[in-house]
Amino acid sequence: MATTNDLKNGMTLDIDGVLWNVVGFQHVKPGKGGAFVRTTLKNVLTGKVVDRTFNAGIKVDVATVDRREMTYLYRDGADFVFMDSESYDQIPVPPGVVGGVADYMLENTIATVALHDDAPLYVELPASVELTISATDPGVQGDRSTGGTKPATLETGANIQVPLFITTGEKVKVDTRDGRYLGRVTS
């Protein structure tokens, strides 16, 4: 148990059995009336963001979320199997928990898996990953380094937009949060 005065960004709260991450908070002391804490909370499971106000000093339940570095090993049916980098335990993670980051995961990808009561909550990848372009239309005469984009398929099967000069077989850096092309990878 903690009070609203102890809130910090990144904390996970258990409010009515639902887990929420504190994204932002502000202590407010108006000239008249009692102080309060205005928070922005993000639902851990759905990603929904809400604003919530608490009276200053009230008790809130802080959930224990264990963030572990794990290695993605393979698909087992629908589940993704991760191995804990410290204990070498293997944990199956359902596709709903992995979410959109599955588009950027290859075998042996290092990821952070958040666990609450030994149940996986979400999977986070680094901000960018390096992947190979498996298919894209060839560039044509006159393509420049600036200008338009074209669709390309990554080795994971995900589709992204890349500049016209990128060819099949090139390694590119991709933002895992929104799937944007960030640049070529030079060896």
From Swiss-Prot:
Q: Which GO terms describe its cellular component?
A: cytoplasm
Please classify the protein's predominant subcellular localization into one broad category.
cytoplasm
Pfam short name (any one): EFP_N
Supply one GO BP term: peptide biosynthetic process
> Mind telling me which SMART domains this protein's record contains?
EFP, Elong-fact-P_C
UniProt GO MF annotations: translation elongation factor activity
Q: What's in the keyword line of the UniProt record? A: Cytoplasm, Elongation factor, Protein biosynthesis
Where does this polypeptide localize?
Answer: Cytoplasm
Identify the metabolic or biological route this protein is part of.
Protein biosynthesis; polypeptide chain elongation
- Superkingdom, natural source: Bacteria
* NCBIfam families according to UniProt: efp (TIGR00038), PRK00529.1 (NF001810)
What does the sequence similarity comment in the record state about its family? Belongs to the elongation factor P family.
Q: What does this protein do?
A: Involved in peptide bond synthesis. Stimulates efficient translation and peptide-bond synthesis on native or reconstituted 70S ribosomes in vitro. Probably functions indirectly by altering the affinity of the ribosome for aminoacyl-tRNA, thus increasing their reactivity as acceptors for peptidyl transferase.
- HAMAP family in the cross-refs: EF_P (MF_00141)
What is the name attached to this protein's record? Answer: Elongation factor P
Origin organism is: Parafrankia sp. (strain EAN1pec)
